[in-house]
């Protein structure tokens, strides 16, 4: 009932011991297995080979005589105490390195065996054996042996394939034992089980996404770049594929070294042996010529063999390291500043671990194994779910479900592999059911992999892990504040969890992989159902009700998280519901379906009021809290975060209470709130959100000394703001009734954002606003009575929004990057000095209906929107100076500027032409793609004359001259004249695109799509395009054209091109708009030999006289023959003019001073 293997030199009686239970198995599967093994000359022992009358105890000695034990777990296995005694003996032999155990799960789930659950567990608990010690020993064996790599036999598994697989693995072990003389085998960490044997066949697992990972890892180990010894750590979350990667590297790099060693499963081996035994494993592999090598000491294990070891460079891979001590045991104590005494320079050492902190100071670099991308994840999943390799794809329905499983796994290789195997040969119904189950909890085996890492955590780290799962994707500072307020040691616990890749921080937020999150929820669910003293976090409505009904211990409840969107029936809370929850730290009633939590239909009732004696609570969130104030017995002494949105609250509590650690208060849209006196002692309050509190008139008796963010948006009765907290960074006064800012507003030395949008009675801005040296964003949109804005000569102001104001002149704003002056009926002109605003990149002039002239604009400007400037007639010449550029996109929009004079239109097209050429010369700075690098539009009905190809209608077809796509082609300029019908009064957006097709040498068409223009209506206001408009865009030479360059660079052939322009909107689709005319220009880089160091010339050669089809090919052939004839003539220096080529007039660029100032601060609104 267990098995072992031996070399050919072992006693001939048997090599394999089979441990099993049940006569049905003996007569069926086991008899077939014995036959298959013996057919391959493998000696087998099962109990029916024993001599009649022989004591059963002597059977245990057969285990010692074996080299392989096959433990066959079936549903009836635990009915036999004898099977369990054998299993305990097998475990003992394996731990001593005398036996290899291969578990076989015969029509029983491995997790059922490991967890001793279901009928399997019931039979074990019903055993007559009363010896508690023995039962404990057997249970350990039941958990331990199934943790080894094994084989699963399903109901539908082909028996012949399974038998072949078992025989193959047995022969593999026997061969290894024969070569090595002895085999030391220890328990296999479940996290290593990504290499578990297939349950349906013996084909070797395929790896997907490994090539890129391997390449990136090899770069850190480069033998040429790094001459000395190099130690690299490979880190990542459990099951992410570290073992797969380092084993692939080991296999690939073995040939680069004469000595190499892979020590895997170090976590398991160090758990079962003393650390001092680990160096022997390494020494045996690096010096195989030594017979039974001896170690010197724990501190210097390789001292005696140092000379031999230093003769050769070595490759050493240490996999599944869990502690720093394991590294010291294998490599000796060292640091990067001192050389290894026994390792020759040029060696390479790779250490794979879940815990990056164990590598601190021991590695030169680390490689973080990330999740698989969707493509590789899908391939890995399909390979195991369907057993195909791209040749015979599965049915469409399964393909769709495959995407959902891959999305669930989020690129986690182990999850993809296990899920694929579980779903192999299952029907559609099973797949759909499995997906529903996974939404509640992870698949069992994946949970067990994570459990290994979780079990190694300290108690504080476990609490932190489970708490963080409740607040994942929240701000790091917020999560740390909550946890540290409960336990000061939580800061270190959070750091440890990050080092072990159980959590991550990204963009200032704490993140947790979905699989880890579901694992944490599963742990909480188990704690709730199993009872005991474990602290619990309740997520399910019924669990919360059970606390009320005293069927669950209230004292152990650590958190309540109730999603009100899932509460479908009216639920009443007893007055004393929270009375005994003395350890409750988090109480959160929220709505996951509405991010603003405004649509909730509250079904939680408190008919008799509420007692809330929660002294330990750190976080109190209660959406639509129904009472006028928090109960008198509520003690906020430890409260960190208070959130009561859309509540009925009128004041927080009666009187004043100590709130020494309160940092965040959110009472948004509590329309009855009129007093905040309860916050007079909140000296650490950092953020206060009172948006929509329409009954609030002032902030009297509120401690604002530490406040950083204050939100009073849409507090329509709020009229005065006398208090100026000096630490304030963001102040939202939009929609209030404030008529002026206090004179001491200049004291806000740290203010970054000030929002006063729609303050309809605000008339002036005090001059002291210029003293706000840190202010980066000022919003005055919709302040219709505001007529003047003070000069700001020295400021960090980056964004100024003055749309909807009555300002008549623009102030001096040297540092502004984004200026919005739209919807201003009083602005007649812009100051001539605007071209000196050296950092301005975005200027919004929409609907400035009195504006008549646009002066020269700064060369840094990337975006100009003058839509609806109905009085605009002229623009400066030049519209803006052209300067050397970096990778940016430029848009100049003059839609609905119906009074633009012809000279203004010509200057806009001239600027577009010059900009296209400049972008052409700088094309090396741009990524290849189909996005327009420059676009403009204006009222008109003609294609500009510099477009060499022009056609009436939306379709342009031409033959392009030979070598048109040579190396100097950098991009294409496109033009479309579009007519808009009068019926488009409700137009909200539209886009103009061009489908460009080129006929390749094989006569196939190579298409690509180019954007030409796009327009979007502002807000929900009605709008329309009033006349025909010209759209121009420049697109960098697409990848498909670059490919033509490479293939046909030396061929003198004509090309055919077809361009079709279309206009689509959000409501109409294609067909309502009409493209009247269209055009194309090919834009080439300048010949650098023509340019001097002082000026840049912009030559745009464009073939314009391409023949229409009715002229045939004769004139084109004549052109080629003439060109060939000219090439044979002696070259003379002369200026030629050909009818079929037009050179766009050369424009000399005047020197423009470079902008030295760099934008360093980023403002988020």
Swiss-Prot record:
Q: Name one GO molecular function term.
A: ADP binding
Keywords in UniProt for this one?
ATP-binding, Hydrolase, Leucine-rich repeat, NAD, Nucleotide-binding, Nucleus, Plant defense, Repeat
> LRR repeats span which residues?
592-613, 614-635, 636-659, 684-703, 704-725, 726-748, 772-794, 795-818, 819-836, 837-863
Question: What SMART domains does the record tag this protein with?
Answer: TIR
Segments forming domain NB-ARC: 211-474
Instruction: Report domain TIR positions.
Output: 12-174
The lineage's top-level taxon is Eukaryota
Tell me what reaction this enzyme catalyses: NAD(+) + H2O = ADP-D-ribose + nicotinamide + H(+)
Q: What class of enzyme is it?
A: hydrolase
Q: What is its main location?
A: nucleus
**Where is this gene product found?**
Nucleus
Q: Which GO terms describe its biological process?
A: defense response to bacterium; innate immune response-activating signaling pathway
Which Enzyme Commission numbers does its entry carry?
3.2.2.6
Domain remarks: The TIR domain is a signaling domain involved in cell death induction. It is involved in heterodimerization of RPS4B with RRS1B, but other domains also contribute to the interaction.
Q: What does this protein do?
A: Disease resistance (R) protein that specifically recognizes the AvrRps4 type III effector avirulence protein from P.syringae. Heterodimerization with RRS1B is required to form a functional complex to recognize AvrRps4 and to mediate the hypersensitive response.
Q: How does it assemble?
A: Interacts with RRS1B. RPS4B-RRS1B heterodimer interacts with the bacterial effectors AvrRps4 and PopP2.
Q: Which family does it belong to?
A: Belongs to the disease resistance TIR-NB-LRR family.
Q: What is this protein called?
A: Disease resistance protein RPS4B
Organism ancestry: Eukaryota, Viridiplantae, Streptophyta, Embryophyta, Tracheophyta
**Protein's gene:** RPS4B
């Amino acid at each position: 009932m267990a098995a072992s293997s031996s070399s050919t030199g072992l006693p001939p009686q048997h090599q394999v011991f089979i441990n099993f239970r049940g006569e049905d198995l003996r007569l069926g599967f086991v008899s077939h297995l014995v036959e298959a093994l013996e057919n391959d000359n493998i000696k087998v022992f099962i109990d029916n080979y024993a001599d009649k009358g022989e004591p059963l105890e002597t059977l245990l000695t057969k285990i010692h005589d074996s080299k392989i034990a096959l433990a066959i777990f079936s549903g009836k296995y635990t009915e036999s105490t004898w099977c369990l005694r054998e299993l305990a003996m097998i475990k003992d032999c394996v731990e001593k390195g005398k036996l290899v155990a291969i578990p076989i799960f015969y029509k029983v789930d491995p997790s059922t065996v490991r967890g001793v659950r279901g009928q399997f567990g019931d039979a074990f608990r019903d055993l007559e054996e009363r010896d508690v010690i023995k039962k404990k020993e057997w249970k350990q064996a039941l958990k331990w042996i199934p943790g080894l790599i094994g084989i699963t036999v399903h109901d539908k598994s082909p028996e012949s394939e399974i038998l072949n697989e078992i025989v193959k693995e047995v022969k593999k072990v026997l061969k290894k034992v024969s070569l090595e003389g002895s085999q030391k085998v220890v328990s296999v960490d479940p996290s290593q089980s990504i290499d578990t044997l297939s349950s349906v066949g013996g084909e070797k697992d395929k790896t997907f996404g490994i090539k890129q990972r391997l390449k990136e890892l090899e770069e850190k180990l480069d033998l040429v770049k790094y001459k000395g010894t190099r130690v690299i750590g490979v880190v990542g979350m459990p099951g992410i594929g570290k073992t797969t990667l380092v084993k692939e590297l080991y296999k690939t790099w073995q040939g680069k070294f004469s000595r190499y060693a892979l020590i895997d499963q170090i976590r398991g081996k160090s758990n079962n042996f003393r650390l001092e035994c680990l160096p022997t494993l390494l020494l045996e592999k690096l010096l195989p010529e030594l017979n039974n090598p001896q170690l010197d000491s724990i501190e210097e294990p390789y001292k005696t063999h140092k000379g031999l070891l230093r003769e050769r460079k070595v490759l050493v891979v240490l996999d599944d390291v869990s502690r720093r001590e394991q590294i010291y045991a294998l490599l000796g104590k060292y640091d990067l500043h001192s050389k290894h005494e026994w390792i020759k320079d040029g060696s390479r050492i790779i250490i794979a671990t879940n815990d990056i902190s164990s590598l601190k100071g021991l590695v030169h670099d680390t490689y973080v194994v990330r999740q698989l991308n969707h493509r590789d994840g899908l391939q890995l999943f399909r390979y195991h779910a369907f057993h195909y390799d791209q040749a015979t794809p599965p049915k469409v329905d399964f393909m769709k479900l495959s995407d959902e499983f891959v999305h669930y796994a989020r690129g986690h290789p182990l999850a993809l592999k296990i899920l694929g195997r579980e779903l192999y040969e299952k029907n559609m119904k099973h797949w759909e059911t499995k997906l529903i189950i996974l939404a509640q909890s992870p698949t069992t085996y994946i949970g067990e992999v994570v459990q290994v890492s979780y079990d190694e955590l300290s108690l504080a780290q476990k609490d932190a892990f489970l708490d963080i799962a409740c607040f994942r994707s929240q701000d790091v500072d917020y999560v740390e504040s909550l946890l540290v307020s409960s336990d000061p040691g939580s800061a270190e616990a959070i750091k440890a969890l990050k080092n072990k890749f159980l959590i991550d921080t990204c963009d200032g937020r704490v993140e947790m992989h979905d699989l880890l999150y579901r694992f944490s929820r599963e742990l909480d669910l188990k704690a709730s159902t199993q009872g005991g003293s474990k602290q619990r976090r309740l997520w399910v409505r019924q669990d919360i009700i059970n606390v009320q009904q005293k069927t669950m211990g209230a004292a152990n409840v650590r958190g309540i998280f109730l999603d009100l969107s899932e509460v479908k029936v009216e639920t009443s809370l007893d007055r004393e519901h929270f009375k005994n929850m003395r350890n409750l730290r988090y109480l959160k009633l929220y709505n996951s379906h509405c991010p603003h939590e405004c649509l909730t239909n509250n079904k939680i009732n408190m008919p008799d009021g509420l007692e809330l004696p929660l002294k330990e609570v750190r976080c109190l969130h209660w959406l639509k809290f129904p009472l006028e104030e928090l109960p008198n017995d509520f003690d906020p002494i430890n409260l960190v975060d208070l959130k009561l949105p859309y509540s009925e609250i009128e004041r927080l509590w009666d009187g004043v209470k100590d709130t020494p650690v309160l940092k965040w208060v959110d009472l948004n849209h509590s329309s009855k709130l009129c007093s905040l006196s309860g916050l007079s002692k909140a000296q650490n309050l950092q953020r206060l959100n009172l948006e929509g509190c329409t009954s609030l008139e002032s902030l009297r008796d509120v401690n604002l000394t530490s406040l950083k963010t204050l939100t009073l948006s849409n507090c329509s009765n709020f009229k005065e703001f006398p208090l100026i907290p000096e630490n304030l960074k963001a102040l939202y006064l939009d929609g209030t009734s404030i008529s002026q800012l206090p004179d001491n507003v200049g004291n806000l030395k740290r203010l970054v954002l000030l929002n006063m949008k729609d303050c309809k009675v605000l008339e002036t801005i005090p001059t002291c606003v210029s003293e706000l040296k840190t202010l980066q964003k000022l919003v005055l949109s919709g302040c219709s009575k505001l007529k003047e804005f003070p000069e700001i000569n020295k400021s960090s102001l980056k964004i100024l929004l003055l749309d909807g104001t009555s300002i008549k002149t623009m102030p001096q704003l040297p540092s502004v990057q984004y200026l919005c002056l739209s919807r201003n009926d009083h602005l007649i002109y812009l100051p001539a000095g605007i071209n000196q605003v050296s950092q301005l990149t975005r200027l919004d002039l929409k609907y400035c209906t009195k504006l008549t002239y646009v002066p020269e604009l700064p060369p840094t400007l990337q975006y100009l929107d003058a839509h609806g400037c109905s009085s605009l007639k002229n623009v400066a010449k030049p519209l803006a100076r052209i300067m050397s550029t970096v990778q940016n996109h430029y848009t100049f929009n003059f839609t609905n500027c119906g009074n633009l004079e012809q000279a203004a239109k010509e200057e806009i097209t001239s600027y577009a032409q010059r900009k296209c050429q400049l972008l052409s010369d700088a094309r090396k700075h741009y990524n290849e793609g189909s996005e327009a690098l420059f676009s403009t539009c204006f009222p008109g009905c003609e294609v500009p004359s510099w477009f060499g190809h022009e056609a009436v209608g939306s379709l342009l077809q031409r033959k392009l001259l030979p070598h048109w796509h040579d190396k100097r082609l950098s991009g294409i300029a496109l033009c479309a004249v579009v007519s808009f019908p009068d019926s488009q009064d409700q137009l909200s957006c539209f886009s103009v695109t061009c489908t460009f097709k080129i006929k390749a040498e094989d006569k196939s068409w190579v298409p690509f799509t180019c954007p030409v223009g796009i327009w979007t209506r502002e807000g929900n206001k009605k709008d329309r395009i009033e006349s025909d408009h010209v759209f121009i865009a420049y697109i960098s030479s697409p990848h498909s054209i670059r490919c033509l360059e490479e293939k046909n660079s030396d061929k003198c052939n004509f090309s055919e091109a077809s361009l079709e322009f279309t206009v689509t909107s959000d409501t109409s689709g294609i067909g309502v708009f009409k493209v009247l005319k269209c055009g194309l220009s090919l834009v080439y880089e300048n010949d650098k030999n023509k340019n001097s160091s002082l000026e840049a010339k912009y030559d745009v050669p464009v073939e314009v006289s391409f023949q229409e089809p009715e002229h045939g090919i004769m004139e084109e052939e004549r052109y080629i023959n003439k060109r060939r004839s000219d090439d044979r003539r002696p070259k003379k220096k002369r200026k030629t003019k050909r009818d079929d080529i037009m050179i766009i007039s050369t424009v000399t660029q005047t020197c423009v001073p470079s902008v030295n100032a760099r934008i360093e601060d980023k403002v988020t609104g």
